[in-house]
Structures are given as structure tokens and as C-alpha cells.
Amino acid sequence: MIGLSHYLTVAAILFTLGVLGIFINRKNVIVILMCVELILLAVNINLVAFSTHLGDIVGQVFALFVLTVAAAEAAIGLAILVVFFRNRGSIAVEDVNMMKG
């Protein structure tokens, strides 16, 4: 049977991969957004695992809210990247830092 420790291990691995991906690849904005989504996925796995372990549904409901916010964040982030790419011709992080504002 798959226990709580298995879910926590998978979530810890996903969280670590997301954080390492952000620190290792600082040049591509799309990869950074994907790593943030990976971190949010690890958080959701923890929420659902603890929710089922404790027999409470609040963690699962909160995971749905996190999924909704993550989807909105990804959509807005990609829309901003498309507009930025059309204006600058590049999506490198160095170019984003040079924006006025």
C-alpha cells in the first residue's frame, strides 16, 4: 500500500527539481514558469496527501484553489511573454530586466 511517506517523497523531489530548475536555468522565462508550476504541483500533492491522511476535505478544496490560481498565473504569464516577444523578438531574462517602468 502506498503510504503518506511515498507521496511526501514524490512531492519533495518535484519541489527540489522546480527550485533547482529556477536556479540552474535563469535565461529562459518559459522554463522558469514551468519550474514554478512544478513547485505548485508539489504543494498540491502535499495538500491532497495530508488531507486524505487526516480524513479532512479542506486540503483537497484548497488544492483546487491553488490549481485555479496556477492556471491563471500560467495564462497571464504566457500572454505577457507573447506580447514581449512580439515587441522585442526575444524572451531572454536579461531583456526583461531592461524594460522601462
Swiss-Prot record:
GO cellular component: NADH dehydrogenase complex; plasma membrane
Major subcellular location class: membrane
Record-linked InterPro entries: NADH_UbQ_OxRdtase_chain4L/K, NUOK/Mnh_C1-like
Taxonomic superkingdom: Bacteria
GO terms under biological process: ATP synthesis coupled electron transport
Entry-linked Pfam families: Oxidored_q2
Reactions listed under catalytic activity: a quinone + NADH + 5 H(+)(in) = a quinol + NAD(+) + 4 H(+)(out)
Membrane-spanning segments: 4-24, 30-50, 65-85
Coiled coil: none
EC number, UniProt record: 7.1.1.-
Keywords: Cell inner membrane, Cell membrane, Membrane, NAD, Quinone, Translocase, Transmembrane, Transmembrane helix, Transport, Ubiquinone
Compartments, as annotated in UniProt: Cell inner membrane
UniProt membrane topology term: Multi-pass membrane protein
Molecular functions per Gene Ontology: NADH:ubiquinone reductase (non-electrogenic) activity; quinone binding
Functional summary from the UniProt entry: NDH-1 shuttles electrons from NADH, via FMN and iron-sulfur (Fe-S) centers, to quinones in the respiratory chain. The immediate electron acceptor for the enzyme in this species is believed to be ubiquinone. Couples the redox reaction to proton translocation (for every two electrons transferred, four hydrogen ions are translocated across the cytoplasmic membrane), and thus conserves the redox energy in a proton gradient.
Quaternary data: NDH-1 is composed of 14 different subunits. Subunits NuoA, H, J, K, L, M, N constitute the membrane sector of the complex.
Family according to the record: Belongs to the complex I subunit 4L family.
Record protein name field: NADH-quinone oxidoreductase subunit K
